[in-house]
Structures are given as C-alpha cells and as structure tokens.
Amino acid sequence: MFNTLLAVFIGGGVGSMARWLVSLKLNSASAHLPVGTLIVNLVGAFIIGLTLAFFSRMTHIDPVWKLLITTGFCGGLTTFSTFSVEVVYLIQEGKLAWAAGTILLNVAGSLAMTMLAFILVNNFASQ
C-alpha cells in the first residue's frame, strides 16, 4: 500500500509541476483561449490512453507503474477545475463563443486524443 501511495504522490507532484510550467508559459499566448490548460488536457488524455492501452497488453508489469502514470502524473497534469473556472470567466466576460469553443476543444479534443492513443498502441502491437 505504501508503494502505491508513494507512486501516486510522486506522479502527481511531477504532473502538477508540469501543468504549472506549461500554463505559465502558454496561458498568456491568447487573451481568449487558455492555451496552456488545453495543451495539458490534450497531452494528459493522450498519455492516459497510451498507458491504459499499453498496460492492458502488458499485464506482467507491476500495476503500481500504471497508477504512477495515470492517477499520479495524468491526474496532476490535467485539470478539470481550472478548465471549468476559465470557461466561467469567459462567460462572465460575455465571450460566449470562446467559452463554447474552449469546452469543445477540451472535451472533444481530449476524447479524440485518448482514442488516438488506443488506436496507435493497438496498431503498433498488431504488427
């Protein structure tokens, strides 16, 4: 149990620091679209897709590694709460089209990235 908690703790810390750095560098790139939040959510969705597809085929690997990457790193990297508050700010500023676009890009984009990761792993594994 301690190893599992430690793995999630380490992964979460690294993921959170990565999110902060990406947001720090990219969120100021656009006055309307929180680019940093979008990037971390898309990258996190892709990484979790890769990880889950990989671990579903490699069942002999200790599942603590999966938790380090998925619950820890991806949980720390991605952010639904920041995404939500950024959308609320856009709505409060009357930027309804930007709010809708942000929702669409984050939700549909994250789903597409996760699906793409599964497809890539499955195609690579079948060759």
Curated annotation (Swiss-Prot):
The chain crosses the membrane at residues 4-24, 35-55, 71-91, 101-121. The lineage of its organism: Bacteria, Pseudomonadati, Pseudomonadota, Gammaproteobacteria, Enterobacterales. GO terms for biological process: cellular detoxification of fluoride; fluoride transmembrane transport. This is Fluoride-specific ion channel FluC 1. It catalyses: fluoride(in) = fluoride(out). The keyword DNA-binding does not apply. It is found in: Cell inner membrane. One of its GO terms (cellular component) is plasma membrane. GO terms for molecular function: fluoride channel activity; fluoride transmembrane transporter activity; metal ion binding.
